[in-house]
Amino acid sequence: DGVEQISGVTVNDFSKPVTYTVKDKIEYTFTISLEYSGLPLVFVETAGGKTIPSKWEDWLEGSHVTIYNTDWTVDYDGPTSIRGRGNSTWGYPKKPYALKLDSKAEILGMPKHKRWVLLANWMDRTLLRNRVSFNLAERTDLAYTPRGEFVELFVNGKHMGNYLLCEQIKVDKNRVNIDELDEGEVDGGYLLELDAYFDEAFKFRSEVRGLPYMFKDPDEVNDAQFEFIRKYVTELEEALYDDQRFAAGEYMDFIDIESFADWWIVMELTGIWEPNHPKSTYMHKDKGGKPVRGP
């Protein structure tokens, strides 16, 4: 419409169709007309209009989130803290975010909790792959798969695009349902993450394969608890990578083999490469039980 456009900077009114002319060696003309996607709407107003900090910084407290259902009724309206999430994904132009509500709340039909994430899916032009992977995992016997709903996100009045609003992986009766670990116990429960970023306070590399294990919940453990898990992982890897012990099936004494098989099938069918690094892959061990793969 005769106004020079600077990507990510120029503000336009799309209440009416807008015509763009793009010139390279050839001139192209496009008319853009926006339509409502029919998805739930998420409006975040940050405290003082501040920029959302990265995951390595403190939460931006004093912010507010309002979520509208598809029929425009209010699903949730209340205070929240917000910051970025992800490691490599935080470096992309479309940022992923984490929300920490002031109190537990049911969001878009998902069970009550304080912690939620907004996945940007920037590398996926279909925007579907995470949700399809979740759907596939839900069809297996895996103990828990995060629930999620597609939404349109607005931050301080700016439309950020399509996001997947889903549950953050946490120990909870409606999420990773394991016992909380008491100080005097060592057997469980534990939520462990394997991640090459290796950025949690309590962590170790396994003795046989050098894999990066981190304690996600509890995020602090005493010496006895730390050593229990470290030795357990060592015994598991020794049973896996000793030819005779593997042939005898000794590794099955240390893991819930059905969950490991289901989890690996999902990884293979969806082409997820995260186990290769590894990044953001999980297992959990309940009191008296074997480690279970996932979510």
Where are these regions (language model features)?
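Phosphate/dinucleotide-binding and metal-coordinating scaffold of catalytic cores
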Residues: K16-P17, V22-P295
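Serine/threonine-rich, repeat-prone extracellular segments and beta-strand-based repeat modules
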Residues: G2-D24
